[in-house]
Design a protein with these regions (language model features):
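Basic, polyanion-binding surface patches
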Residues: 1-218, 226
Length: 226
């Protein structure tokens, strides 16, 4: 297949859809759709979102030193898109979408109670990169619906029905597709064929329901040393 050189642009597939909850200086709860974001550190557990200074959420995070990151399900796709279309300076996004603001018990930030789960974060670091500033939040807790918990007692993507954004190359929202294989397992045969019987790194580490009760790294699975 012929390869084509393209100009640099912010494109990856896929992107998580992340709804960032904050309080303003006036105490008003706000919610926005952050296009750029994801997990950025295992210990301490951290998530990052990148925001423009023009957004209300940018200023709210600096004021409150906290934010939440909620993961919407497929039934929230219209609401998730809406909160990225209008500004909290002019709209009450919780009221407009019918989502219910719930104050986090761990940080000074709201979350949408209808979302399957939300990360509760204190502002850990922030760095201006250019047009965007990256806000790194230390995850102090997770508030989740009991019925979306799966292996290790954590939210399961098949149960949360989390949605994905196709990115700059395909500006649509998508549902999670078919399961292809278990991470840190499906490549075992290939590794054995290339390296003999060396121990395989990774795989399930905790029996179901025992997450957090074992000593060891805080991350859910061990990453290969690459």
């Amino acid at each position: 297949m012929k390869k084509i050189h393209l100009d640099p642009i912010t494109i990856l597939h896929p992107h998580p859809v992340l709804l960032v909850g904050t309080y303003g200086a006036d105490g008003k709860p706000n919610l926005m759709n952050a296009a750029w974001g994801g997990i950025c550190c295992s210990d301490p557990p951290c998530v990052a979102v990148s925001l423009r200074e023009a957004t209300l959420t940018y200023h709210n995070i600096l004021h409150s030193q906290a934010f939440t990151v909620g993961v919407p399900s497929r039934k929230h796709v219209a609401a998730a898109d809406y909160v990225g279309l209008v500004s909290g300076r002019d709209h009450d996004k919780f009221r407009d979408t019918g989502l219910t603001p719930l104050k986090s018990e761990r940080v000074h930030a709201p979350l949408a109670s209808e979302l399957p789960f939300s990360l509760e974060c204190r502002l850990f670091q922030h760095h201006k990169l250019g047009l965007h500033t990256i806000f790194i939040g230390e995850i102090l807790g997770i508030l989740a619906d009991e019925d979306v918990l799966g292996l290790y007692g954590l939210p399961d993507i098949e149960k949360t029905q989390a949605i994905l954004w196709g990115g700059m190359g395909n500006n649509h929202y998508f549902a999670v597709g078919e399961k292809l294989g278990q991470a840190f397992s499906v490549g075992k045969n290939l590794k054995k064929s290339l390296a003999g019987a060396d121990p395989v790194v990774g795989g399930p580490r905790f029996p179901e329901g025992t997450w957090g009760k074992q000593k060891g790294p805080k991350s859910g699975v061990r990453s290969p040393k690459s």
